[in-house]
């Protein structure tokens, strides 16, 4: 991945790095934590980006989520829904998921006239429109970090997938700086990530999830929504712990 380009997606089951771990208990390697965060953010980016392929569905069906059990109730709820749904997959599963994804996250279906497209500005602006104030803030954050979307992607920059990719990139940057003994630089990236998570993901994700749950029809995407909520909440704690450990705050 080019460090100055926002990647399009990661493939669930191949790049989610579940065995890398997010345990911040004594003895956990910081690099392992950072890689685990990055990989999981990449998986979430993929899940909200576009309908899954058959290969992605099959990969997720055999993915071992056990290392993450007990993170929090929301995460456990989400994993339970996802794994139970995929346990009963059949020849029509991919199409069923594609229809559900398109209905909810591509905005082809609404609830009381409102869609659940995963854009921050839709949920953080009074008008509920694309490309409002938060969009410009996100664009500025990418620019400051020397990141940009891949050419050909016409989604606005405040799409949830891009927000997750930003978090993944910043986690790996912090990891690389630690490898180079640049602790101060790593802490700066982690502080940036912590602020970005709070301001541009946690600030609107609950409202997005609430609306999406009124539209999605499959247990799989109900699980994805809960899993993401649990992970974001957990990562806020992880970032606090990492900054405290590295900067002594």
Annotated model-derived regions:
Residues 2-249:
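Surface/interface-facing alpha-helical segments and adjacent flexible terminal/loop regions used
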